[in-house]
Amino acid sequence: MRAERLSPLLALGLLVAGIRSVHCLPENVVVKDRHRRVDGHTLASSNTDFAFSLYKQLALKDPNKNVMFSPLSVSMALAFLSLGARGPTLTEILEGLKFNPTEIQETQIHQGFQHLLQALNRPRNQLQLSVGNAMFVQEELKLLDKFIEDARVLYSSEAFPTNFRDPEAAKSLINDYVKNKTQGKIEELFKDLSPRTELVLVNYVYFKAQWKTRFDPKHTEQAEFHVSDNKTVEVPMMTLDLETPYFRDEELGCTLVELTYTSNDSALFILPDKGKMQDLEAKLTPEMLTRWRNSLQPRRIHELYLPKFSIKSNYELNDTLSQMGIKKIFTDADLSGITGTADLVVSQVVHGAALDVDEEGTEGAAATGIGIERTFLRIIVRVNRPFLIAVVLKDTQSIIFLGKVTNPSEA
């Protein structure tokens, strides 16, 4: 007899929205508690490893489709869920998140996420970033006091009584909450909910920043983007002449350009040589990302051509997570740390993401002469074929977005 047919259901919603322009926050904000960032850094390696593992699974499903997701959102939601997991279920989640339970204690992991969450949500100059968690609980469901307290203290989770026996009303309540938290970028996280649902855990991320050196819309023109050998589309192509971190990786056959936001966070664009995308994807590792970031050097790019795009994605992650070793939560889960009984299973894990990249931003005082190594070669970078993008928050080294743009003309 299959457990998932009998057990009350739990659903995870994970979402992120990101866009590119921002209104500056007051410049006299003082950042305190520097030690918290150190705790955040201890998670960076595992989170990056998880990010690339999840990316590879999503990219394999359809190599010709756009991929866009937030590793930070997915990993934080699963860590939140693990608060209530016990035994092999807990071990699977932690190992799936690329932690070694024999080397790091569960409490250290949760405290690390707690400090990371606090670091991400502190007031920042020139960046709007909001990360949060919420629980939607069936009205008569009794949660353990310890789970409620840990969810509040470690994951800053809000809790909302919900009547899942009216699934349409419950869906509207959750989707409206998500829409509000993401400034309208994610409108329908859940397309349906079972009336047997008992609990929904939601993690959201909202990111809004502007380029340090903006693209001039007057220079944006329609240009060809080569989706594949036999398919070309017309897209708005932005162009810029600037000095920015750049690296040509001859070993892997790719070009890297890092564009910074006014907040000094950055977007790393990785452009494989023609026919090299799958080879590059197979070699994505945390060590490779570290090597790339250490190899980036300021260069004058005389002509940078970058497509303007707006991509939304929605994923059901049940099968994907199972392939990554996180299986028990969907079948014979032990989530007794939530209610005291082992009768909950996860019915669905959904993830929504939205990322806009366009010309908007302020022209910041980018360093143009100090520490800049000039080159006599004229560097031209045309991002006119499928590429990878990683948006990285500088102080915590968190990958907030990771994706592949195969066709910028597809929303």
Curated annotation (Swiss-Prot):
PROSITE patterns: SERPIN (PS00284). It comes from the Eukaryota. Keywords: Cytoplasmic vesicle, Glycoprotein, Protease inhibitor, Secreted, Serine protease inhibitor, Signal. GO terms for cellular component: chromaffin granule; cytoplasmic vesicle; extracellular space. The record marks L377, R378 as: Reactive bond. Its main location: cytoplasm. Residues 1-24 form the signal peptide. Homodimer. Serine protease inhibitor. Belongs to the serpin family. This is Serpin A3-4.
